Amino acid sequence: MSFPYFISPEQAMRERSELARKGIARGRSVVALAYAGGVLFVAENPSRSLQKISELYDRVGFAAAGKFNEFDNLRRGGIQFADTRGYAYDRRDVTGRQLANVYAQTLGTIFTEQAKPYEVELCVAEVAHYGETKPPELYRITYDGSINDEPHFMVMGGTTESIANALKESYAENASLTDALGIAVAALRAGSADAAGSDQPTLGVASLEVAVLDANRPRRAFRRIIGSGLEALLREKDSKGSKGAQNPKGARDSKNSKSYGESTD
């Protein structure tokens, strides 16, 4: 007499968690961090059409790591939810916390009820409305529906430990856009070098996806930084780094940080 195969609920949850974590770790890394003007998103992404960073609503942005088809479905669902709520009530009723809670409920249901969990990790970020002084909000939503409030920065996908350690050492509150981009790119390089076991690789315009939630924009805060705008920011970052190496006691110059990256939404 044969007995039916039995697996305990605890073991089933462990196996699902392991599957999801491995899938997320195989993806390329994404960094989101607060800076003086709002929130900066930087992702390792050589593709120009398969984007990991997106606008959800007027003051709310989205970034993700993991399986593209899964987080893209979540992204589109979040946009539809935000548009419907903003139309039915008021645009200010759509908040980052609200969208993060919706994603957490969706992922929690998928994790417990479906045969395979989503191999995704999400970031929902929000900046204050124009004229307000509320600090940016960053929410991390994991594959099992857990939600955490991240005060300054967060890392998803790839070699998160080495990137997070680099950010802990170099992150500065209220940094300019140029400085924040330099911090994020240096951390991503540290993670890529750790994964490859070699020197830090070059991350340039062709291999980066960059966007910001700019709190100084009147309505739609999200804008992408692409092409010549991104190239100028990276060039300024490199020149400031070389000047800092030559004159480490020199004063920080951030006057030009707002003049770059004016690209399309």
UniProtKB/Swiss-Prot annotation:
The formation of the proteasomal ATPase ARC-20S proteasome complex, likely via the docking of the C-termini of ARC into the intersubunit pockets in the alpha-rings, may trigger opening of the gate for substrate entry. Interconversion between the open-gate and close-gate conformations leads to a dynamic regulation of the 20S proteasome proteolysis activity. It comes from the Bacteria. InterPro entries: Ntn_hydrolases_N, Proteasome_alpha, Proteasome_alpha-type, Proteasome_asu_bac, Proteasome_sua/b. Pathway: Protein degradation; proteasomal Pup-dependent pathway. GO terms for biological process: modification-dependent protein catabolic process; proteasomal protein catabolic process. Keywords: Cytoplasm, Proteasome. One of its GO terms (cellular component) is proteasome core complex, alpha-subunit complex. The 20S proteasome core is composed of 14 alpha and 14 beta subunits that assemble into four stacked heptameric rings, resulting in a barrel-shaped structure. The two inner rings, each composed of seven catalytic beta subunits, are sandwiched by two outer rings, each composed of seven alpha subunits. The catalytic chamber with the active sites is on the inside of the barrel. Has a gated structure, the ends of the cylinder being occluded by the N-termini of the alpha-subunits. Is capped by the proteasome-associated ATPase, ARC. PANTHER family: PROTEASOME SUBUNIT ALPHA/BETA. HAMAP family: Proteasome_A_B. Component of the proteasome core, a large protease complex with broad specificity involved in protein degradation. Belongs to the peptidase T1A family. This is Proteasome subunit alpha. It comes from Mycobacterium leprae (strain TN). The gene is prcA.
